[in-house]
Regions:
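Pocket-flanking alpha-helical
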Residues: 1-3, 19-58, 68-82, 99-103, ...
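Short beta-strand and adjacent tight-turn residues that come in two discontinuous sequence segments
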Residues: 21, 39-40, 62, 92, ...
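Short coil/turn segments
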Residues: 74-78, 93-98, 140-141, 159-164
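Pocket-lining segment of extracytoplasmic ligand-binding domains
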Residues: 124-127, 131-166
Length: 166
């Protein structure tokens, strides 16, 4: 957005329009030629390329060097590791890899995954914490920043610190 606002694209002879589609996943929209390229997360691309009917897309670059996401809870909740997830409610996006990551992290921490209640998030972000759910999966550079800007203190459990495979 800043580059567009400052005219950097135009200075290089590029006519750029930034579109934020809400109807569909990034990989699907690019495959349907509703965008020239998209910026997405690794799991979206992996699923698109390994599906029974793979999407005609190609990953060409990474923007960040490592996973910058993790689980969050309210700072005063007492939930500071996956060992604390038992008996709690997790709100997520319902992606196919989501449960597998939760289960792996909980198992590694000695917790019973079957004791975690999983619901689909209503999209309200950090505002849902402590109300409709106890924990969520946030992207540090976006969701955690937004929560901090709104005075919401969080416990952040970075995925790559919870399991080296992540």
């Amino acid at each position: 957005y800043v580059a567009l606002d400052k005219g950097y694209y135009e200075a290089e002879g590029l006519d750029v329009e930034i579109v934020e589609p809400t109807d569909g996943a990034t990989a699907t929209l690019v495959a349907q030629q509703k965008g020239t390229f998209g910026i997405s997360y690794q799991e979206d691309v992996t699923i698109a390329l390994t599906a029974e009917d793979p999407l005609p897309i190609k990953a060409v670059a990474t923007i960040i060097q490592h996973n910058t996401s993790g689980f969050v809870s309210l700072a005063d909740s007492g939930i500071t590791s996956p060992a604390d997830f038992e008996g709690k409610t997790y709100a997520g996006w319902g992606g196919p890899g989501e449960s597998a990551v939760l289960e792996a992290c909980m198992t590694q921490a000695g917790a019973d995954f079957s004791k975690l209640n999983i619901v689909v998030s209503d999209g309200s972000g950090f505002e849902a914490l402590g109300k409709s759910c106890d924990l969520m999966w946030f992207f540090e550079g976006w969701d955690c920043v937004m929560a901090a800007m709104n005075g919401c203190e969080l416990n952040y459990m970075e995925l790559r610190q919870l399991d080296e495979r992540l």
